[in-house]
UniProtKB/Swiss-Prot annotation:
The lineage of its organism: Bacteria, Bacillati, Bacillota, Bacilli, Bacillales. This is Mannitol-1-phosphate 5-dehydrogenase. Pfam families: Mannitol_dh, Mannitol_dh_C. Its EC number is 1.1.1.17. It catalyses: D-mannitol 1-phosphate + NAD(+) = beta-D-fructose 6-phosphate + NADH + H(+). The keyword Nucleotide-binding does not apply. Belongs to the mannitol dehydrogenase family. The keyword Cytoplasm does not apply.
Length: 374
């Protein structure tokens, strides 16, 4: 079985790529990072350290790489032969790889199933990828393609920090992982996804993860940044920051329990588990890494604004989320284009107007009024 995975970064190698190899696939990583691609082709393997109570290092084999910047034709050919195509490139990059995927799918001659799964921290990223891919195809090509091509949304969860290593391919991950895939959208009777969990309805899993794991991580990062903390572990050692994270997750819990009828007690246990993961003593996750991309993370459907908006519109006061939104408007990470853009926007318009533009909310929206008081 053959898999093509876009994104040979830490998440691609340490999470999705490793799971695909474990499920029996030969994995071709597609990326523009020349050094990583060259190293993959030189060795055809890499090491993953699982940082639990005992550090265990595994070797992931049966891998290779393609530089899509210099060898796009080779990437297209690989897609034409693949059984599965996955991504971990960041949601904003999906439109840029869609044309290559479309060309590879058009080139397929065998009438066998192929499935696309975008493994991104965004709601229904595969659905977005599908739109982007189909925009490069004619109506006839689309009809023919969709007979054999599945586009399955997924929820992904694993902390993969940037850990310094002399080995460019070595990656460190936490023991916990969750890859949940929407089963009805898959094509083929026996899709091999190994340790992935296949579910009939993905929506609850996407939102539970986004509004617990990603929200909690964001709160720790943005509050930690303003408090001068360097790592998430250091941030959560501060009782004030831990209180802020717990407060925000209690607010998102209220939304999730009402929207999806999650058991409140079970969800509280889930929050406890997430907080323990964030405090893993064997992981050094940088505040700057977690906070990067603040404009996307302040978007109307993302981890902070969506739950805060939901609660504010019900007449509730999402204090912890609103405080974090205000903290996020101060965030800056060197080398992060969105940080540069955010700083320029705030300098030009001020915090409240900048927030309105990013969140697509009117100035008289109850959430904006709460944030303005911060």
């Amino acid at each position: 079985m053959k898999a093509v995975h876009f994104g040979a970064g830490n998440i691609g190698r340490g999470f999705i790529g490793a799971l695909l190899v474990d499920a029996g696939y030969e994995v071709t990583f597609v990326d523009v990072n020349e050094k990583i691609i060259d190293a993959l082709n030189e060795r055809n393997e890499y090491k993953v350290t699982v940082a639990g109570e005992r550090k265990e290092t595994e070797t992931v084999t049966n891998v290779r790489g393609i530089n899509s910047k210099t060898n796009e034709k080779e990437a297209i050919d690989a897609i034409a032969e693949a059984d599965i195509v996955t991504t971990a490139v960041g949601p904003t990059v999906l439109p840029y790889i869609a044309k290559t995927i479309a060309q590879g799918l058009k080139q397929r001659t065998a009438s066998k199933p192929v499935n696309m799964i975008a493994c991104e921290n965004a709601i229904r990223a595969t659905s977005q990828l599908k739109k982007d891919v189909l925009s490069h195809l004619s109506e006839e090509e689309t009809t023919a393609l969709l007979k054999d091509a599945g586009f399955a949304d997924a929820a992904v969860d694993r902390i993969v920090p940037n850990v310094q290593s002399d080995d460019i391919l070595h990656v460190t991950v936490e023991p916990f992982f969750e890859w949940v895939v929407e089963k009805p959208a898959l094509k083929g009777d026996a899709v091999q996804l190994g340790k992935a969990v296949l579910v009939e309805d993905l929506a609850p899993y996407i939102e539970r993860k986004l509004f617990t794991v990603n929200t909690g991580h964001a709160v720790a990062a943005y509050v930690g940044y303003r408090k001068g903390k360097k790592t998430i572990k250091e941030a959560l050692a501060d009782d004030y920051i831990k209180h802020r994270v717990r407060g925000a997750l209690n607010e998102t819990k209220a939304m999730l329990v009402e929207e999806y009828q999650f058991d409140a007690e079970a969800h509280e246990d889930y929050i406890d588990k997430i907080l323990l993961r964030f405090q893993n003593p064997h992981l050094e996750d940088l505040v700057e890494r977690v906070g990067r991309g603040p404009i996307r993370k302040l978007g109307p459907a993302d981890r902070l604004v969506k739950p805060a908006k939901y609660l504010a519109e019900k007449g509730l006061h999402p204090e912890s989320l609103a405080e974090t939104i205000f903290d996020a408007l101060h965030f800056y990470a060197e080398g992060d284009p969105e940080s540069e853009e955010l700083r320029a926007l705030v300098d030009e318009k001020g915090y409240v107007d900048a927030f309105c533009e990013i969140s697509k909310l009117e100035k008289d929206h109850p959430l904006v009024e709460i944030v303005a008081k911060e």
